[in-house]
Amino acid sequence: MADIKIDSKVFQERVSHFYNAWKADKRSGDALFGGVSSIVILMGKVDENPEFHKNNAIHFWLLGYEFPTTLMLFTLDTIYILTTQKKAKYLDQVKGGRYPVEVLVRGKDAAENEKLFIKITDAIKAAGKKVGVLTKDTSKGPFIDEWKKVYADNCKDVEEVDVAQALSAGAFSVKDETELRAMRTSSKACVALLTPYFLDEMSNILDQDKKIKHSALADKVFNKLEDDKFWKTVELPNRQKLPADLDPEQLDWILGPIVQSGGKFDLKWQADSDNDILHPGIIIAAMGLRYKSYCSQIARTFMVDPNKSQESNYKFLLAVHNLILKEIRDGAIVKDVYTKAYNFVRSKKPDLEKHFLKNVGFGIGLENKDPTLILNNKNTRTLKDGMTLVVTTGFSDIQNPNPQDKNSKVYSLILSDTIRVTSSEPVVFTGEAPVDVDATSFFFKDEEEAQPTPKKEKRDSRVGAVATKNITSTRLRSERNTTVDEDADKRRREHQKELAQKKQKEGLAKYAESTADENGVEIKKFKRFESYKRDNQFPPKVKDMGIVIDQKNATIVLPVMGRPVPFHINTIKNASKSDEGEWSFLRINFLSPGQGVGRKDEQPFEDASAHFVRSLTFKSTDGDRYADIANQISNLKRDAVKKEQEKKDMEDVVEQDKLVEIRNRRPAVLDNVFIRPAMEGKRVPGKVEIHQNGIRYQSPLSTTQRVDILFSNVRHLFFQPCQHELIVIIHIHLKDPIIIGNKKKTKDVQFYREATDIQFDETGNRKRKYRYGDEDEFEAEQEERRRRAELDRLFKSFAEKIAEAGRNEGIEVDMPLRDLGFNGVPFRSNVYIQPTTECLIQITEPPFMVITLEDIEVAHLERVQFGLKNFDLVFVFKDFTRPPYHINTIPVESLEDVKEFLDSSDIAFSEGPLNLNWGVIMKTVTANTHQFFLDGGWGFLQNDSDDDEVEEEEEESAFEIDESELEDASESSEEDSEYDSNASEEASDEAEDSEEEEGEDWDELERKAKKRDRESGFDDEEERAAPKKRRK
């Protein structure tokens, strides 16, 4: 114990925390501490196999070490510590704080030792009539026996009160950041031993059909704890390594490892692994570790060749486990959590009710199991932010309806995770160990019968679905050739045929029955409009029997046969005023069936066969009043249509939950950034903060000018560096749109900072007189490179922090792959479009484009024909009600790269020479999707593509185009592309110019060109370009 150093600051902080809880309980009625005025903690002789209870825990919590044969007495005024001389010199380090500490040293003289014990008993009696003790304390040894004798003689009138729960609530259960860090580390160490180490060992044993005892496999895992090399090199399932500051020497076992299989399961972990042979069926593994005195546990169920019943029950176990995790939060009552889980089991699968465990976990920390914090249906304790629990969900001894052998008749299922309670969903410290069915199921029986799958090319982890071979170190757009690799083209055609067949099969399976109503044209419903519920709600002016416009209720009250009749504005089509002599006429037209064939006139009616009044006409000599009424009706109609449209636009806007702010520490901040879409008011940079369940952008202009984005609403997170760009970007694509600023609806929120500063021209500056050459320009360039690199590092680091904070929602940082990008026109301007692992994006300038690849049903390349300089790309989504997405005017040089990108992303595509009417096509698809796939589905696109390719080959072999015809073709191609509404304005302008200008005769142009070519030695390419250049 020569190097023992007690942290006196931590000691005083924790003593203060404990005393504050004690005094607060006294003020509020002694509900927790039971009115005790002193507390005695005893530590006896250390056992060979120590069990950690609250007496050990108080030592570790306050001192960081365990001091055997030591007595601690806490009174409201003083802390007394009675120990040996050797230990006393270390305890002198904690003296001198807010709460006085008196260290009493015992020696070998029994009489002197008895006097010290009497001094302690006198302090207990002086403090009050109630003393707090640990009634279940099992401390043993001569020291304990001596104390009990003196205590029995001197404290006969003192009442003992069990303070186990008080110590748990006031000291151990809520952890500080240092304690939580130790628990996170011990949890990750548990994960590392379970997955990958135990999982790999178990898989190899089963794969090679070896016979091994449970105890032997457990010993392998047990001995791995001493392997320092393992701890330095092991990777967790999420490819992360353990913390660099991990000290393997401070790791120790608290549970197991326990391995169970073959129908014998004990989910209370009361026995070590037995000597039975590992049975390939249901296998349970559980283990627990201690790191820096803080414990964690984990347990997983692995299934080998499970039947449908076992898979179903495991999925249900996972659902119950997730339900419990969602219910655990700050303020929840323990028994309520268990009751909700129990009721869920009873309602969904009543046959499993009797197999459900009697508790769903317990508190953990310095104690490997806090007996005062058992998660059962009797515990009334309230969970608090900072508590750590082991959540255990299990079903024991379930009967197997289809046992494969005698050892498979009965099985159990269990999941155990160490978690931290927060104000929202808990943080699962052992969450890196997978729990889904695919990760925990192993199939060996059908392995030989399975068809061999073709070996996939190894892909870079950053690239994902994008083909790796498209990435080269020095490939520029200008260097891309348009020649086609025949082998690659053949391979791509074969792959595309497979994808097309797969899409057709999926479509037939998904839409096995007619879906005209579900996925077809939306059926409009008849809406009832009630202007007034009672007569007394009519406007007072109706007594005059005139036409009254009620703006408040959006109603026009008309006099009909001496009675006021209300008409809601939505029943009126329009109103008009006309003059005839001295009379003015007001005509009000109503909506009725059969008025038109346009989409706007498709108005639903309750009974279309009923009689309808189509119009009412009123006449008067007061023309000005009629003009005013007609104007008011038109304005009211316009406002109603606008309001209805706004309501429709906001239908998909989902109200987010509240952002839970971090209170106990400063949140991670990225300062001096702009947001897009921009907020109201002056454009000024704000800051982005990472909180518990989301991020917040705060404008410096006002505290109300802020944008909250929850992690649960984030679908994609992108970081785009400032290389080749003027700004560095963190871009968030949302699942559901949110409102920003003045009712701006958006699914994309972006934070950016400009990467370049304003440059000053210093020509003629005094400084330039004394500096020659370009040294200053070189320095400025170097400085800009450094600034850009620093900006990239800063934004990338912050994006990774966002992903880390939202890892429970599956958020990962994605970066665009610039080398695979291409130019195109998704909206009005020509932009550079780049693929990422999961998307195709353009986030440099608004409007932004984010297309998720997994949402795409098929892609179609339009205007792919000889002579055209560009083509269009159309994406059809799996949600057929969503309009297809067009990217126009892509240079033909990018055609092969786009095809390769689509093919490597497993997107079925086709091509054709013309632009298709996608509105009509999608209307056909949605009208009856079942029939659409029966008729061949998307095959009609592929058939057109194949026909075009055959025709093109025949044309190429039949004749050779000359220069003049090539010019004509290129002009006409520009004209053909003009009708696409989304084509670039530049292309349209060029086409119009070529139509309007008149050039020389073609024969004359050709003669002159040949003559000039002979004189200057130009090649064919320049010969073709010369006439066109002259016409421009």
Curated annotation (Swiss-Prot):
Sorted alphabetically, which SUPFAM superfamilies does this protein's record hold?
Creatinase/aminopeptidase (SSF55920)
| Biological process according to GO | constitutive heterochromatin formation; DNA repair; DNA-templated DNA replication; nucleosome assembly; positive regulation of RNA polymerase II transcription preinitiation complex assembly; regulation of sister chromatid cohesion; transcription elongation by RNA polymerase II
Q: Where is this region: Disordered?
A: 446-513, 943-1032
Identify the stretch annotated as signal peptide in this record: none
Q: Where is the composition biased (Basic and acidic residues)?
A: 476-508
MF-aspect GO terms = histone binding; histone chaperone activity; nucleosome binding
Pfam families under this entry?
Answer: FACT-Spt16_Nlob, Peptidase_M24, PH_SPT16, Rttp106-like_middle, SPT16, SPT16_C
GO cellular component annotations of the record:
FACT complex
Q: How does it assemble?
A: Forms a stable heterodimer with ctc-1/pob3. The dimer of ctc-1 and ctc-2 weakly associates with multiple molecules of nhp-1/nhp6 to form the FACT complex.
What family is this protein classified in?
Belongs to the peptidase M24 family. SPT16 subfamily.
This protein is called FACT complex subunit ctc-2
Gene encoding this chain? ctc-2
